[in-house]
Amino acid sequence: MRFSANIAIIVNIIFLFIVVEFVLPTFIRSGDVRFRRYYRNNGRVSRAATAKKERIWPEGIIPFVIASNFSGEHQHLFLRAMRHWENFTCVSFVPRQPHHKHYITFTVDKCGCCSYVGRRGEGPQAISIGKNCDKFGIVVHELGHVVGFWHEHTRPDRDMYVDIFYKSIQTGQDYNFEKSKPEEVDSLGEPYDFSSIMHYARDTFSRGAFYDTILPKPNSGFRLEIGQRVQLSEGDIRQTKKLYKCAECGGTLMQESGNLAIQHAGVCTWHIISPQGHTIFLNITGSTLSPPSSLCGKEEDNVITVRDGVSISSPVLDRICGGDSLFRTIASSGNRMLIQVRSSTPAASLPFATYYAICGGPIYANEGVIHSPKYPESYPPNSDCQWTIHVDENSQVAIEFVYFHLEQHKECIYDRLILTEGISKNSKKDGKEMSETFCGLIEKKTIVSKTNQISLRFFSDNSVQKTGFELRFTKELNECATDKNICHHYCVNTVGGFKCACRVGYSLSSNGFSCDSTCGGYLKASNGSISSPNFPEMYPNSKTCIWEIEAPDGYHIFLNFTKFNVEGMKTECAYDYVKIGDSEKLCGEYHEALLFTTPRNRVRIEFSSDSSVERDGFFANFIADFDECQNDNAGCEHTCQNRLGSYVCTCNPGYILAEDKHNCKEGSCFFEVNAPAGDINSPNYPNDYPKGQNCSWHFVTTPGHRLMLTFSSFQVEEHAQCKYDAVSVYDGGDGSAQLAGVFCGLAPPPLLLSSSNELYLTFSSDASVSRRGFQAHYTSLCGGRLTAESTPGHIYSHATFSDSKYGKNQDCSWIVRAKSPGRGVRIQFSTFNIESEEGCQYDYIEIYDGPEATLERLVGRFCGDTSPEVITSTGPELLLIMHTDNAEEEKGFVAEYREAPRSSSTKRTFVSKTRHSPLEEPIHDRNE
């Protein structure tokens, strides 16, 4: 079904800074639970009005800048949204150049999702894409404000089409539903558009879940969901074309190739857009113009004008008058071409030109951007593109990977990008050019060439295609080799500048170039100790200490941290940290000793503190120890492990150490597995497993979580009933639990998921044939069905609780059922720390009085650091749901549950940073 449309638009043109508030409903399935997820942002800046015509962007050209704090994923998203507008209308989004005085800047402002309406006309203007705004449809919506559109429901005649429910609107947000004055907006003769991407959703600014703030009138005939954030509606497209007076003949062309045909007399305009780093070739193939006109030279009649860019002020590549020889090929210098045809007489609708975009070629510039074919969409199969970048002499080429996603392979044999350096006396290696190959997903990377020239070649095969890449290149100078280098110790060249560094035992002073004697140092000794500055007192802020410890050749260094308390969450060391060699950063507080053995006779230890919180710090002893394992494995049959002052032999899984403490023999094969995730394998894997073997693994993860087992390799002697060798998996803590399956042969078992926090696996082999065995990965998943008994059980928000914060984009559900008939479930929280937000729209806990997530069963939604009150179900079951978004994380929660007498009623509350009174019944329930 197709709907007519309209958007409230600037007339006389209105200037407004507008904040978009909406709810984007998405159904999420978690186990057997079905519920809605909401995204909201709060606040709106008061709007200002003007009657100046300058608020329309001249020629529909909108220059843009993207703030550097956005990731490559964000920049790819913004470009997709801009291309969406360009594809269906005649507006153009172009990277800002120095001559552009007025332009938009993608940024993050306190308003969340917000933008000015139309062109502000005072230099740069912000389009804020804040938290939870980074969705394709939301960015398209925000760009609608930039183009010149108000929210659809603010048009003066909206009361004929929608009802506003003010009692459901959040306090202080009523003004978001105010009607515009008739002199402020113009519908351009178009009817109301429920399908517009500029329309509010039914529960935008609602004061609670399932509250409606705006709905189509019952007699409107519209039954679909309003507030879509998927794509421009047909009404959006029509109104944009009216607002910017788009030519009826022509259009925007983004395909790799196509035809141009004059459909009628008058003006036809085509914008051809290709990815950056591509060249557009236009072939004029036929004559469709009338005889020469005296007005042709003025581009007023019977003329084809081809311009090298997007604007009528762009350089003219060619101008062809009627009667001229039309057959010719015209090439652009960039990735855009504008073709305009003016004719005085009707012409047959036949193609008069073809075009195609070619990737690659030489680039002589000191800065620029290169895109993969069809970017920001997926690149085509069988691509082969080569670019050669030349910058000024005596310079280097710096290439930044803004966005990069090609088909993954460990050797990049499918799709790949190859960077090859120009040969110079410094870049030769065995007489060959220096090259490097890339594929897969690369989040951030910068490469600097040795010379002023570098070649890039992109290949794709005929199978899997990804979204490609955006690369930015700039001319780079080695400032460390110039008189700009004022560093006291070391100068480290960076793209666009340099930074200073200090020798071991010194730290960089606040001026950024001098070095002060401080903590750290070079220690060549067999034993000693190191500690954080001021230990055992608090270490200072903004301090960096580096120690380099060296022992004699053939020795290892043992480190024993007897005290360790450094700001951080252990696995998330974003603030202060200790880094040992190339290992991960250490932080947090440890009450037990931390022991480390270095793989070589040298180790580098770095301590760094930020500008805020201090802790006690650390104290560590070190001692050099001779590595007996380096000589003939110290006589160990399987594995030799060096120990302080000695060594110890260990055996592979399924074997035990013999009496001589060096050789290995088959023995007990039972394993207790308590880590939340890891890998297991059959005895002697990847070699054949021994005959007559019986092994078992008992997996136990964090309470309130389940275990998922995935086999990555599987070769067990085959038999129809698995009578010889077999892997058996039980859904519980031992072999008496429910059997999940018995497996053998070459086909890996399916993904196995436990119903509780325990799983039991056995492996047995007979006395005959043996195979390679198996390798499996296990991980912990939140949620599941739990049984409440008289003794308490526990639910943890995440499997690594206390070691790290909960994860992003989590949707977990727990159904707790009382074991005894006639009993209910009582739940209380001993720890509660969920991202705080007034409406609990980002991260939250929901509790339902029953097994289903329905409005009438909702007890409340909770967030912040205030624990909910004790909750007891009125029936045998209770449902707990946890949702997290893609931004901030906190410590999480620990909930205790047990069976209890059923409650006669359950108070419905809504908790965020502070506790609110019980919710009123909704004015309009949702129809699910």
Curated annotation (Swiss-Prot):
Disulphide bridges: C90-C246, C111-C133, C113-C114, C249-C268, C359-C385, C412-C439, C480-C491, C487-C500, C502-C515, C519-C545, C573-C587, C629-C640, C636-C649, C651-C664, C669-C695, C722-C744, C782-C812, C840-C863
UniProtKB keywords: Disulfide bond, EGF-like domain, Glycoprotein, Hydrolase, Metal-binding, Metalloprotease, Protease, Repeat, Secreted, Signal, Zinc, Zymogen
CC terms in the record's Gene Ontology section: extracellular space
Signal peptide coordinates: 1-30
Compartments, as annotated in UniProt: Secreted
E.C. no: 3.4.24.-
Residues that bind Zn(2+): H141, H145, H151
Key word Cell cycle present: no
Family annotation (InterPro entries): BMP_1/tolloid-like, CUB_dom, EGF-like_Ca-bd_dom, EGF-like_dom, EGF-type_Asp/Asn_hydroxyl_site, EGF_Ca-bd_CS, MetalloPept_cat_dom_sf, NOTCH1_EGF-like
Compositionally biased residues, Polar residues: 902-912
Tissue specificity annotation: Expressed in pharyngeal, vulva and body wall muscles, intestine and several neurons.
Superkingdom in the source lineage: Eukaryota
Span of domain EGF-like: 477-516, 626-665
Coiled coil: none
Chain spans, region Disordered: 895-928
Bias type Basic and acidic residues, positions: 917-928
Catalytic residue list: E142
GO biological process assignments: dorsal/ventral pattern formation; protein processing
Function summary: Metalloprotease.
Name this polypeptide is given: Zinc metalloproteinase nas-39
Source organism per UniProt: Caenorhabditis elegans
